Amino acid sequence: EEHLMQAVEDLRKETNGCVLGMKADVCKAEDCTTLIDQTVEEFGGIDILINNAGKSAASGREALSDEAWQEDLDLKLMGAIRMCRGAVPHMRKMGGGSIVNATTSAGKAPGSLALPTSVSRAAGNNLTKSLANELAKDKIRVNAVCIGLIKSTQWERRSEKGSLEELYTELGNKVPLGRVGEAEEYADLVAFLCSARGAYITG
């Protein structure tokens, strides 16, 4: 919650705009409903939805319990479904909108020990294409960004025993471009997909 409030403060300073910050668990339907309702109350509607909830979860099948599978699917797949269910009616009222689902490259090309994330994200990619086909008539575009290696606090936590830059260098050696991506590069792509310049991109 501290990071959320800091992000709200930073955005207000940078944009001088109205920013609403709320703590919500997308695994809980009631939290999703409250988030949608308060957003509509504050801004008068919804025309952009970015489903970005997730956490690092990757291991082999034998180490995964039913509960671990369900938890990952509930967060990454059902969370997106709940938020889309709540936001789409408001987008229709506004004459259209844009939804971006954050998935991962493992959802298209999984490596070993990538479960359950690779399955949850593959389902997210399928959800994206299904909704894109269904909602196109309402001028609602739906896209997915299959994220690769991006600098984040998750990697910072993993580097406690060593240098963060050394970890990024090691990870970057596995990437064709030779480096780990910046969060701003991911954000720029999402902003493009949500903008008028991405108006002919869906699915």
Put a short name on every predicted segment.
Residues 1-2, 23-34, 66, 184-185:
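The beta1-alpha1 cofactor-binding region of Rossmann-like NAD(H)/NADP(H)-dependent oxidoreductases
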Residues 60-73, 167, 171:
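Substrate-binding pocket helix/loop in short-chain dehydrogenase/reductase
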Residues 64, 110-119, 130, 158:
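Active-site loop-to-helix junction immediately N-terminal to the catalytic Tyr of the SDR YXXXK motif
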Residues 84, 120, 128:
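Active-site helix of classical SDR
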Residues 89, 133-137, 199:
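Alpha-helical segment proximal to the catalytic Tyr-Lys
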Residues 108, 146-157:
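Short, flexible catalytic-loop segment of classical short-chain dehydrogenase/reductase
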Residues 179-203:
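C-terminal substrate-recognition "lid" of short-chain dehydrogenase/reductases
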